[in-house]
């Protein structure tokens, strides 16, 4: 039987520590916080590797064997109902591999949803709950936290894109969650978020429920030399190597952001280049190929925008990281009106085309940014 060779540059999910680059100190610190029963607010830009770090922590032997590890991403949730849905589904997903006794105990706690849980032909539970089935989210949330408190092992719950709860229409969600978490002594939480300003307000403002509730961790880009060594260790399996100059170009082209570097390395690993030593032009051609593949998807994405919104998006992409969109220099350079910018920037922020962080505006998608720069 022909064995399919695994591409070692993982771009979705988490496989094992072997395919996870560095973060040794961060993994140790996060593990130490959680085993010392501290909640953690993990704050870093999107695609820098927060979820990978969490999964890597959960794979540590002293964590994996002694805790129930639960991970949910609430980026797409819009209200408390959807949050409860995601949390319940995430817990069941984590418990299913651990045997009937473990997951059955959880399901028996969910009296408000018991009639909506279904089972496959092998008798394994399926999260067939619909958002509309959660008639009383506060009651279901109480049942979920009752399970966390009474589970046979302590639980670690990671909630990714946690700042999303601040935008729910129910204005007391932060207080609701804080109260339940405070009274739950058998679980600890990782609150992971990419919008640094919002996360900082949630965890450092005295007026917010989560004030001083968690240890705060940040993430920086992985060290360039460490990443180069990791890349060449895995490229060697395919009889390839990337030059230091080529990797420096790749690393700085994407500001050291893990996901984009992994994506390009993933493509380089299987490139048809005859060279054993990959150079800067190999990296350039690979990036061009990626942008070409994405072209139609980006055209459809931009079709959602008005002409003025698109004009502002292109201007931000061309400028790189403008600190002000209302300066006369910026407006004149890109032929924009102040009133146009004021209206368009809110739409672009709300739809996650751009982000405003640490005093600068930039596109959320680096590939889209490069595509717009190229015209």
Regions found by a protein language model. Give the residues of each.
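C-terminal helical "lid" of AAA+/P-loop NTPase domains
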Residues: 247-253, 259-273, 311-314, 346
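Conserved Walker B catalytic segment
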Residues: 127-196, 204
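C-terminal leucine-rich, beta-strand-based interaction scaffolds used for sensing/assembly
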Residues: 2, 6-7, 292, 296-375
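Conserved C-terminal helix/linker of AAA+ ATPases
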Residues: 271-293
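Short, locally clustered residues in the helix-turn-helix/winged-helix DNA-binding domain
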Residues: 34-35, 163, 255, 269, ...
